[in-house]
Each structure stands twice: as C-alpha cells, then as structure tokens.
C-alpha cells in the first residue's frame, strides 16, 4: 500500500514537470513533493502508559509561493503510516497492563515558511511551520457492526465495519536544509526537521526527527 502511494506521488511529480519554467526564484509559484524518513521515538503518557513508534517512510505534497529569492511560503499535507507498540495501564486494577501492536495513519495539513540565505542556485535554508495532525490509531473502540444494502451493480451487499480510536493534535516544526535550483525548472531540496506533536495526555509534547528529500517544479 505504502509503496503504491509513493509510486503515484512520483508519477504525479513527473507529469507536472512538463509545465515547469526555466530556473528562477523570482516571485512565483512552485509545486513540490518529498519522501520523508521519520526516526523512531518513545512517548510516555499520563497514568504510566507508553508507546514506542518505529522509524518509517511517508510522503509530503506542497504548493509554494515565492515572495522573492529569499522568502517562500508553503502549504501542503504530510501522510504517513507508522508501526508502534503500546503498553496500556489499567486504571482500576493496579499493576495490570496490556500490550498492543498496530500501525497508525497520520494526515497533517501544514503551513511553512522558508528563508534562503543565498540568492544563487545553491542555497542553505531554514524553515518553521505549524499544522494540525489527524491520527487514526487503528485500535478498535467499539464492537464490529454489519450493514447491508442494495448496490445497483453488485446486488445485495453486506459489509462489516469497526470504528477505531482517532485523535488530533497541533503540530509545529523547525528545520534546515539545502536547495539546488537547476537550469531547467527543477529544484531539489534536502532537509532535516524537528516536529513536535501536542498530543492529549502525553507527559510532554513528543518530538520526532525527520529527513526529507524532494523535488520542486518552478513556475
């Protein structure tokens, strides 16, 4: 599933490249996509529960507007699935715990500002952003429910659905990286970012390290 999503991202980026203009960081628009590598992290929660998140791969798509050679604003969405193991502490029976394994899905719309230090084609940059992450833990929070209906093509169809525990969190990040503008309308960027999630019931806002490799099409 994840490999298929990344393949669609790559094909979409190639298709959009046809309209890219010659290299320039003057005022204008750009479209970008990144592959994200997020490192593992352990998070402690109130009551003694904890979760260990494995390192994983995600993708990011964004639209940017360049005010000038130095300052850019980007708006987009991150998507990732992360495997985790959580230890749940019973709040009634002391010492009773349960361990669950699963994978969560996170979709995070964001807004981010980039500042380029050099006006030339190769420049280091710093970034800062905010977002809101919608997280599905895939932990069931109710019994399975079955519904049936008449489908115009398949006839009488029944399916079983089970709701899962979802949450959301305010996020903020800072980063630094390098951007290289080629002469044919492409730009490449490599960045390191630190992301914080204001998770409900966490002892403190957990932070995650991210490494991003992306391509930008300049218009």
Regions of interest found by a model, annotated:
Residues 23-27, 32-41, 62-149, 180, ...:
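Gram-negative (and chloroplast) outer-membrane scaffold detector with strong preference
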Residues 37-62, 167-168:
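Surface-exposed strand-loop-strand hairpins of Gram-negative outer-membrane beta-barrel proteins
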Residues 80, 165-171, 181-218:
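Contiguous, function-dense segments enriched for cysteine-driven chemistry
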Residues 51-57, 101-107, 164-171, 205-207:
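Short sequence motifs at beta-strands and strand-loop junctions characteristic
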Residues 44-51, 94-102, 158-164, 198-202:
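Extracellular loop and loop/strand-boundary signature of outer-membrane beta-barrel proteins
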Residues 145-159:
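Low-complexity, compositionally biased segments in intrinsically disordered regions
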Residues 1-27:
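Cleavable N-terminal export/targeting peptides
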Residues 14-19, 34, 150, 160:
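Residue-level detector of bioactive/disordered segments in secreted/extracellular proteins
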């Amino acid at each position: 599933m994840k490999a298929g999503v990344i393949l669609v991202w790559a094909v979409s980026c190639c298709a959009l490249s046809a309209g890219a203009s010659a290299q320039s960081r003057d005022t204008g628009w750009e479209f970008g996509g990144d592959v994200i590598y997020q490192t593992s992290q352990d998070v402690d929660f109130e009551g003694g529960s904890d979760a260990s998140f494995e390192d994983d791969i995600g993708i990011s798509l964004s639209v940017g507007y360049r005010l000038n050679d130095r300052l850019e604003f980007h708006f987009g969405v991150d998507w990732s699935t992360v495997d985790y193991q959580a230890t749940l502490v019973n709040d009634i029976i002391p010492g009773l715990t349960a361990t669950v394994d699963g994978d969560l899905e996170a979709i995070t719309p964001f807004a981010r500002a980039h500042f380029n230090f050099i006006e030339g084609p190769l420049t280091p940059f710093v970034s800062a952003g905010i977002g809101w992450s919608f997280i599905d833990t895939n932990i069931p929070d109710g019994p399975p429910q079955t519904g049936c209906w008449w489908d115009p093509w398949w006839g009488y169809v029944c399916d079983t659905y089970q709701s899962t525990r979802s949450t959301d969190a305010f996020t903020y990040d800072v980063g630094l990286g390098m951007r290289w503008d080629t002469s044919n309308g492409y730009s490449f960027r490599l960045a390191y970012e630190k992301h914080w999630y204001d998770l409900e019931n966490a002892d403190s806002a957990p932070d995650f390290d991210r490494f991003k490799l992306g391509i930008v099409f300049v218009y």
